[in-house]
Amino acid sequence: LDADAVIVTHTHDDHWDRAAVELIAKDKPIYVQNDRDAALLRSQGFHNLTVMTDESTFGDIRITKTHGGQHGTDRAYAVPELAERLGEACGVVLRHPDEKTLYIAGDTVWRDAVAADLQKHQPDVVVLNAGYAHVIGFGPIIMGEQDLLNVHFLLPQAKIVAVHMEAINHCLLSRRALREYVEANQIGDAVSIPQDGETVIF
């Protein structure tokens, strides 16, 4: 795997799977959200682990764990079994003196605390997991098209990269449908919807 380091926002199977365990070198620097995830990765043989804080670093890159996200609706988290399954999933802000500030929202729905994170950090580039995955009867567990528009209205100068579509079977929003929505709302200059494996450079 050609990466200097890895950030694991959480350890659901669609983010951290058997392929990751097998392909990533056990001494690769890996940043995780909490002690629980660190313990899991340690049990899988990884030993160069950092639990992210509000101010972690990797070389000249400042890594800030955000706390505003929630991997589902309040209704879903009111059910203890479902809350345990959804768990915690963080966002991350990356800053470097010579690069644009990047905010990776992670698996979260749109909520006031996410808006507060965006206003606080003022990122130049925002990566949104925008497949609009749902738990039946409990609503979305990640963002959808309206949420992407909310981000654009809040930070109109930011570039938005929409990912995590067509990734798992409970994602309701396809790349094609999101592209049509973006065009209908005339925000195409602000939004990238990359294909799997595509690199986006700003």
What is the predicted function of each stretch?
Residues 10, 15, 83-86, 108, ...:
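Conserved phosphate-coordination/catalytic loops
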Residues 1, 52-120, 196-202:
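Core dinuclear metal-dependent hydrolase active-site scaffold
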Residues 1-33, 37, 48, 122-127:
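Active-site metal-binding motif and surrounding structural segment of the metallo-beta-lactamase
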Residues 40-51:
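Helix-loop-beta element that forms the nucleotide-linked donor phosphate-binding surface
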Residues 4-5, 100-102, 125, 159:
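Structural motif
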Residues 24-30, 100-102, 190:
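Short active-site oxyanion
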Residues 39, 109-196:
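Cap/insert and terminal regions of metallo-dependent hydrolase folds
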